[in-house]
Amino acid sequence: MPVIDCKLFVTDLDGTVLIDEKEAGSRATLRLKTALRALEARGTMVCLASGRMHESIRVIGRDLGVRGPVISYNGAMLRDTDDAMLSHHTLDAGIAGEVVTLAEERGLALNFYCDGVLYARKLQPWWDLYLGRTSSPVKPLDSLLPMIGKRPTKLLIHTLPATVLALRDELTPRYKGRATLLITADEYLEVMPIEADKGHALADLASRLSLKAHDIVAAGDGNNDIGMISFAGTGIAIANGREALKQKADVVVGPPEEEGLAEFIEQNLL
């Protein structure tokens, strides 16, 4: 593959840039950090795009040494380099209230993301699992019922993989055309505003920057990355990522522990 004239490099974090080290949390390799910093140094804008909260992504960005725009909450929020809000979509309060009630009645662990704060009940083992993966600050509540009536940026149910699949099949017809339901990890079912999509957020950002698809390279490993790698002129999938994503990708590279993305950047973007 010839060297790509990339003006905007967009990448997912977990499983794409970050290695999940279980008890030790997630990290990026020095080689990949160096490659991302070299991209910015040559004038390529580096945008981090994740399902995580904006504040959590900025912490990771500082560790990586990059400071471009941020797509957070799986595309529900877009902020520019100076953290100015460019777009923010929220979930209908009625839908959010129904999901909160369902989770409380069934004893399901639910994350409620609202106004930059993550609220959750301390239900094990899901509390420790989520904190171990993301290190996000959480405000614990005895019940999420008081949150009914608010418009969260997104909701995340974490439970057994089989239950995640069953819930998706149960709730998708109910909220068709009104909310997006997406499995972002085997144990995660996210309920998001219908407008929330990394691809839509990337298209919005590209328009604001007067960039065309061929100016953009995007990388990811999950179903929530399909939109953005499909929009980008060059879409990169991680080898151990979701099959549906790999089918849409132009290039497949090794996982972060094998330095696949770092090697691609070194050989094709620098």
Where are the predicted features?
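Asp-based phosphoryl-transfer active-site loop
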Residues: 5-22
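Residue-level signal for inorganic ion chemistry
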Residues: 14, 39, 74, 155, ...
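Short, acidic loop-to-helix structural element flanking the phosphoryl-transfer center
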Residues: 25-44, 88-96, 137-140, 195-207, ...
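Active-site phosphate-binding/coordination module
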Residues: 29-127
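Short active-site oxyanion
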Residues: 43-47, 67-68, 154, 214-216, ...
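Short, structured coil segments at secondary-structure junctions
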Residues: 64-66, 73-74, 175-177, 231-232, ...
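Conserved acidic, metal-coordinating active-site core of Asp-based
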Residues: 102, 106-109, 113-219, 223-231, ...
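Asp-based, Mg2+/Mn2+-dependent phosphohydrolase catalytic module
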Residues: 231, 236-270
